[in-house]
């Protein structure tokens, strides 16, 4: 007789997980009870409002014409193995689910991978999310125009300016005393040309006006 406290089905986004005795065994192998999985699904389900998210189904279900799966908020995980175990748990009706990332949202396209993400990509996405929270998504996206990883973002990030010339004026005001070195000729200093030279060799500016030192 089935336990009356355990639901016989768990709703996902498109479809349901049938809670059979074998499914309960697989969940236990992954460190879940049915109640644990219900709570985890609430915690990890993405609202698709900008957070880094992936829709996780399986190749087996997809080949059978089913889109059963769940939008998962990656920022709710700190550990790649925990993420994988949760994905396997929501597909515990398969003996050995081959996970399939069917859609993506909220992180750069270079980490989209239908064949499912690697641990390195997962770590990059979590770092991306944390940097977006600390700085801004526009700043991090600008950096990603020039780089594939985020290791040097904080060392490289200078701030946001309206133009290369504005940034050149900032550099001059911070680093030089033109009036002392040039006298009245300081009024004729070509900030536009100086800005072009800075961004030719030492700096980059993204589409949103964020500036990065080349490190």
Predicted regions span which residues?
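N-terminal ordered "arm"
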Residues: 25, 35, 42-91
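Intrinsically disordered, low-complexity coil/linker segments enriched for acidic/polar
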Residues: 7, 20, 31-36
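N-terminal acidic leader/helix
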Residues: 6-15
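Acidic, proline/glycine-rich low-complexity IDRs
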Residues: 35, 46, 58, 168-215
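Structured domain cores in non-transmembrane regions
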Residues: 78-148
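Extracytoplasmic/secretory-pathway segments with low complexity and glycosylation-like composition
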Residues: 133-176, 184, 212-215
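Extracellular/secreted glycoprotein ectodomains characterized by long, lumenal stretches
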Residues: 94, 127, 153, 177-181
């Amino acid at each position: 007789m089935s336990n009356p406290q355990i639901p016989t089905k768990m709703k996902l986004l498109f479809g349901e997980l049938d809670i059979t005795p074998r499914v309960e065994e697989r969940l236990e192998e992954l460190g879940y009870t049915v109640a644990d999985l219900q709570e985890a699904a609430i915690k990890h389900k993405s609202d698709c409002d900008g957070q880094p998210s992936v829709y996780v189904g399986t190749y087996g279900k997809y080949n059978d014409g089913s889109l059963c799966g769940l939008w998962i908020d990656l920022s709710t995980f700190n550990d790649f193995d925990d993420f994988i175990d949760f994905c396997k748990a929501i597909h515990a009706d398969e003996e050995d689910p081959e996970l399939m990332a069917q859609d993506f949202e909220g992180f750069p396209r270079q980490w989209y991978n239908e064949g499912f993400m690697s641990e390195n990509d997962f770590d990059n996405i979590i770092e991306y999310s944390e940097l977006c929270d600390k700085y801004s998504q526009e700043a991090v996206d600008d950096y990603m125009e020039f780089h594939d990883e985020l290791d040097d973002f904080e060392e490289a990030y200078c701030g946001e300016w309206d133009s290369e010339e504005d940034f050149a004026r900032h550099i001059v005001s911070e680093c030089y005393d033109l009036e002392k070195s040039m006298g009245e000729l300081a009024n004729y200093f070509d900030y536009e040309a100086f800005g072009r030279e800075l961004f030719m060799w030492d700096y980059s500016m993204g589409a949103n006006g964020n500036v990065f030192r080349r490190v």
